[in-house]
Design a protein with these regions (language model features):
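His/Asp/Glu-rich, glycine-adjacent segments
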Residues: 42-169
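Solvent-exposed loop/turn segments at secondary-structure junctions
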Residues: 1, 29, 97-100
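Short, structured active-site-proximal loop/turn typified by the sulfatase FGly-forming signature C/S-X-P-X-R
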Residues: 3-37, 41-45, 91
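Beta-strand elements within well-structured catalytic alpha/beta cores of enzymes
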Residues: 1-3, 13-14, 38, 81, ...
Length: 169
C-alpha cells in the first residue's frame, strides 16, 4: 500500500525510482501457486500450479513437496531475461519449485529423507557444488527455523548471507 512506504525509507526510495502495481489476490493462496505467480507473472490457470502437491490418478500416488520446476507450465522471469540477454546471470533463492529451473544460480531446501526415518540437512543448488561451499562458510541451512513452531530470523539470515556469498562468487 502506498501509505506503508512512508514507514520504509529504503523501499520508498526504490519505488520512487521504479514502478509499482497493485497486487491482486490469487487462489489458491498457498506456497507453490503464489510463488509460481511471482515467477511467471501468470495466474494458476495459466501456469498450472494449483497446490503444494499432486495426486497421480494412474498410480494412485500422492507427491508432496518434491519441488521440480517442470510443474510450472509458463515461462519464468529468468527464461524471459535469458531470451532477451543470454549473457545475463540469473539467480533464484528459495522458491520451492526451482529444482531444475533455467536460472544460473539456484538454492532451495532439499533435506535428505533417510531410510531409517531420520533427515539429513541439505539444499539443492545450481551449480551442484554450491551448497557445499555455502555450508562450509555458513553451516547447514537451519531448516527447523524455516517454518513451523521454531521459525526464526536464523533461516532468513542464512538465506540472505548465502545469496550475498553466491553473488560474490
Amino acid at each position: 500500500r502506498p501509505s506503508d512506504l512512508d514507514q520504509m525509507p529504503c523501499l520508498s526510495a526504490l519505488m520512487g525510482a521504479g514502478q509499482r502495481q497493485p497486487l491482486r489476490a490469487s487462489f489458491p493462496a498457498v506456497t507453490w501457486p503464489v510463488q509460481a505467480n511471482m515467477l511467471t507473472g501468470c495466474r494458476p490457470s495459466q501456469h498450472g500450479v494449483v497446490g503444494n502437491g499432486f495426486y497421480w490418478r494412474e498410480s494412485h500416488e500422492v507427491e508432496m513437496w518434491t519441488a521440480w520446476n517442470e510443474k510450472i507450465q509458463a515461462p519464468q522471469v529468468w527464461d524471459l531475461m535469458h531470451q532477451d540477454s543470454p549473457e545475463l546471470t540469473s539467480a533464484v533463492w528459495f522458491p520451492m519449485l526451482s529444482k531444475g529451473c533455467g536460472a544460473d544460480f539456484v538454492c532451495m531446501p532439499a533435506p535428505v529423507h533417510n531410510p531409517d526415518g531420520s533427515e539429513s540437512l541439505w539444499c539443492y543448488t545450481t551449480p551442484t557444488e554450491l551448497y557445499g561451499d555455502l555450508r562450509d562458510e555458513l553451516g547447514h541451512f537451519p531448516l527447523k527455523n524455516f517454518w513451523g513452531p521454531l521459525s526464526s530470523i536464523d533461516s532468513t539470515a542464512w538465506i540472505v548471507d548465502s545469496a550475498v556469498m553466491a553473488a560474490g562468487s
